[in-house]
Amino acid sequence: MSSESSFGLMQIGLATAEDIRGWSYGEVKKPETINYRTLKPEKDGLFCEKIFGPSRDWECYCGKYKRVRFKGIICERCGVEVTRAKVRRERMGHIELAAPVTHIWYFKGVPSRLGYLLDLAPKDLEKVIYFAAYMITSVDEAARHEELPNLQVEHDIEKKQLIDNRDGDIAAIARDLEGEIARLEGEGAKAADKKKARDSADRQMANVRKRADADIERLEQVWDRFKNLKVADLEGDEGLYRELRDRYGMYFEGSMGAEAIKKRLEGFDMQAESDLLRDIIANGKGQRKTRALKRLKVVNAFLTTNNSPLGMVLDAVPVIPPELRPMVQLDGGRFATSDLNDLYRRVINRNNRLKRLLDLGAPEIIVNNEKRMLQEAVDSLFDNGRRGRPVTGPGNRPLKSLSDMLKGKQGRFRQNLLGKRVDYSGRSVIVVGPQLKLHQCGLPKQMALELFKPFVMKRLVDLNHAQNIKSAKRMVERYRPQVWDVLEEIITEHPVLLNRAPTLHRLGIQAFEPQLVEGKAIQLHPLVCGAFNADFDGDQMAVHLPLSPEAQAEARILMLSSNNILKPSDGRPVTLPSQDMIIGLYHLTTKRKGSAGEGRIFGSVSEAIMAFDARDLHLNSQVKIRLEGFVPYSGWEAPEGWEQGQPAIVETSLGQVLFNETLPADYPWVEAVADKGELSRIVNDLAERYPKVVTAATLDNLKDAGFYWATRSGVTVAISDIEVPAAKPEILAGYEERAAKIQGQYDKGLIDDDERRQELIEIWNKATNDIAAVMRESLSPMNTINRMVSSGARGNWMQVRQIAGIRGLVANPKGEIIPRPIKSSYREGLSVLEYFIATHGARKGLADTALRTANSGYLTRRLVDVSQDVIVREEDCGTERGLVTPIAVADSNGELVLDENVENSAYARTLAVDVVDSEGNVLAAAGTDCGDVVIDELFKAGITEVKVRSVLTCESSVGTCALCYGRSLATGKTVDIGEAVGIIAAQSIGEPGTQLTMRTFHTGGAVSAGGGDDITQGLPRIQELFEARTPKGVAPIAEAAGRITIEESERQMRLVITPDDGTEEIAYPVLRRSRLLIEDGDHVTVGQKLINGPVDPKQVLRIMGPRAAQKFLVDEVQGVYRSQGIGIHDKHVEVIVRQMLRRVTVIESGESDLLPGELAERSRFEDANRRVVSEGKAPASGRPELMGITKASLATESWLSAASFQETTRVLTQAAMEGKSDPLLGLKENVIIGKLIPAGTGLPRYTEVTVEPTEEAKANLFTGPSAFSDFSYDTLGGDGAPEFHAIPLDDYDLGNDFR
């Protein structure tokens, strides 16, 4: 990751034959690979050492030169250069083709680039390339024009001659016939013989006429063809073409195959073509104009870059280095080889055969066939299976071509460039480590020793426990006692990273300080399980070791688990006590009436604990205790004369006192019962107001107390705890009666089936709720199940209802609700039929979960891809704009209450303008961070909405600015410059994706009054929104304000708007069963929804503009997540929506260099217009374009990022043709080329920091004997040798080398 080799751009282009020969170290002439006896590469073959370099370090092929001292010498016997064997990974060869071939990507890709350039249909192009038709490559217009009259005369003479010959022949036959007839009559022959002679003569005449007419027609055909012959004409009739060539060959040239294409490209005038196309675009319309636009894109690509279109036809094929297509010997003496070798072998074989045929001067038809086969061989090498049947290997498996090496999850991009395997890592099963502190993890001794091996070895040598590295290595491998002491010393303060797959968000990798533990399992702190989504049923985790001092510093400062208490998606704590801890703290803080010691007064906490130990006092009894350092809570009635800091006598319970002792000393007294909600509030408050150290310590205290008291609470579950409510049969009987009544009405035909279903479902839902309510009342407060659910430790009331109350209604395999309920509970046991019905839902649940996981993962991948280059690049973009966000709404009584979504909308944002009250006093200045406190103050002052900065209105040209983004939810402070907010947004939206329901719900029959339409919800709805698809059953929205009239016909309804401004009426045809949201004669406003159903975001953009479209998308996405009770901050959705609306479609190009119909980044569009306007020319006009996330990712400026996402070959084809440069601004591009990512500490503003020691430090440094004579202070530059660097063993002199 060094910065020495840094470059700012990466360009891709078309390679010409010269480039290919320039890269090559020699020509591969033979298809041989290695000699099977000697196992050495064959000369001039695919693994030849002369071309690709020696297969053993510093050794030539024939063995004349061995050893490093001959470095660089080229052996005169075998011609191999003496060098390292690893050059076989980088040296390329080439194959000189006997005939040119076209590059399949450019002719077969969609759209066909070659076809667009030469204005040929792909079908015709294929005919030419594969030798099915001739193509005219040039016509000598002047000569033809000059000679045409003479040629016409010659043609006429020849034609006349043919006619004369024909007539002469016919006359001769007629004469012969007359003679024959006369002879027959003389012989007195019968009439039949005469008829026979006549028929024979007629047949002869007909044949002569037919033959002659065919010749005349062919002559006419050839002449017409020649008269109208022009470049690019195709001729599939070989005979006609031959005759044309024989007669008029001097006036034109034509050929077949890639040669024809090559000749055309050589004589192609790009500039003239470009001017012609621009003319068509300016004046043409319809199909002609769109085709011209598409062609102009291709022509322009070659005009504006130094790419030559001849690069699309190859005269030489590059051969990739042999180590990248290896051949390895298997156990049985057989060889396994890369598919590429087979494909290259076919190319070489066919090429050599073609050369031989050309030398022999074989007939054209044979040569053409061989050329076609060569073309096909090169096609399958580049992209097997793109055209025709793929070439298969043994077992009918298609061979993997060069394109397949790049594509897909197993391709080069995703397998090796974006995700690599790393050293210094290990994995093991996890177990719980309740004794750990929040920032610690337990690391098994053996694992730690293996991970820290090089560090341990160096330290052993430093401490003189070992003479050299080799003996140190032996000591480590034999587990000598000194090794453990050294290991203990080394791992102190050296954090390790723990990761659990799937890593759905940034909390899936955190840093911990390792503690050595016995056994082989990693120990994990219970509070971080939530972040990792880990449990201890056999989950595994991976450990990674940060090596460099910078990496360790980042791990400690940014990634330590105690610094990651908040969830990046909503800014709320993720390290909340759960399950056992909650039940323990709940047990500690409940109050019990009438238990031992109630009403007593204690002089101190110790006295109360003594009474508790003596069994005189119950933990939960209400008593009075004198407390030191009591901090009152709001609402506490202080005794007269009491002052803060004095001891206070508080009425509480001992458990409550013990609970409050776990909180910080200056934290206000908590009197509430510590259930899940209360604990969440406390941790939230701690995170907001206290330093991280205090918060982490408090969380550890809560965890310890929770486990301690959970153990002592004796919470268990017995079957006797499950009490079926006595009133159940009575309630059921009442509802049975009502259900029977409904069924009766249906039998009499008073209601239809849909209504019956609806009524029954309603009745049984009521019954279920009634039984659930009765069941909750009948459970005693001390019932353990009640305590578990009430405290929020585990389970919910719905589960309890199914165990102790009633199972209720279930769905059938189609997902429709069955109108007969399961009346038993699990405690009573289900009947066979009930059990069978219940299994449907269970099976469906499992299937859905599996599908959901895959879909959700793919959604996250697309989101990351579209937003990966959104990084905070500057402090403030200086915009005045923002979004107006409500913070308070009026409730049903007209009183103001806090908006329920304020947590995810206004919270953690920056104010865009001053907030002023009715008297003009500034309550909060612009630029203030809206925390809980500020929002609370504004709410109390009666403010209902505020204008806040948003990513959507940010004016930074790349990325976004810190003020528009606001507070970083993960840290609770203003976001740092360099924070990759795009990726955090993608993770925050993708991570809860698995919890979203999969299906489009269908509750059977007419659920919504809209005729029981499927309402797409959950994950499919999120995908539909982010992909900007038009939803199913879309509802029209009013395009203008005006009066509406409804016209009904047999088949459909028409909604007609008469606009207020007098423009022409707008009609919307809708289905008759649609549910109208307006009535005849209503007045509608722009953008108002007319019928029930989902709205198409593209229509919102078209009619109401980009602002409304952005708001619509954010609200809709949030609606889906909120319906499932998942809180995500609006700003994350906004980052994605901003990326979807980043581009503009150019309508008129004005005098700018933009093409009409082109998709341009908004920043590029605005820059081009600014430039044109400043020169006093006409600017381009455009309309904002809403792109789905997949399309937006593929349309990115960075071709590396797009190619590694999807449709790799298509992206690379286009990028190479346009000679695209990748500015390397995003994260993926930099990961691919192995540079530090331009985010966080990888930004130049951090990497170019140099550390200068103070004078004092310099003086101290040189007092003792220094380990380094030329000490470097540039520790961040990494040039000095900082302490604890791992020693690469290959480069280390092992001293006693016995080899």
Curated annotation (Swiss-Prot):
DNA-dependent RNA polymerase catalyzes the transcription of DNA into RNA using the four ribonucleoside triphosphates as substrates. InterPro entries: DNA-dir_RpoC_beta_prime, DNA-dir_RpoC_beta_prime_bact, RNA_pol_asu, RNA_pol_N, RNA_pol_Rpb1_1, RNA_pol_Rpb1_3, RNA_pol_Rpb1_3_sf, RNA_pol_Rpb1_4. GO terms for biological process: DNA-templated transcription. It catalyses: RNA(n) + a ribonucleoside 5'-triphosphate = RNA(n+1) + diphosphate. It comes from Pseudarthrobacter chlorophenolicus (strain ATCC 700700 / DSM 12829 / CIP 107037 / JCM 12360 / KCTC 9906 / NCIMB 13794 / A6). This is DNA-directed RNA polymerase subunit beta'. The RNAP catalytic core consists of 2 alpha, 1 beta, 1 beta' and 1 omega subunit. When a sigma factor is associated with the core the holoenzyme is formed, which can initiate transcription. Zn(2+) 2 binds at C877, C954, C961, C964.
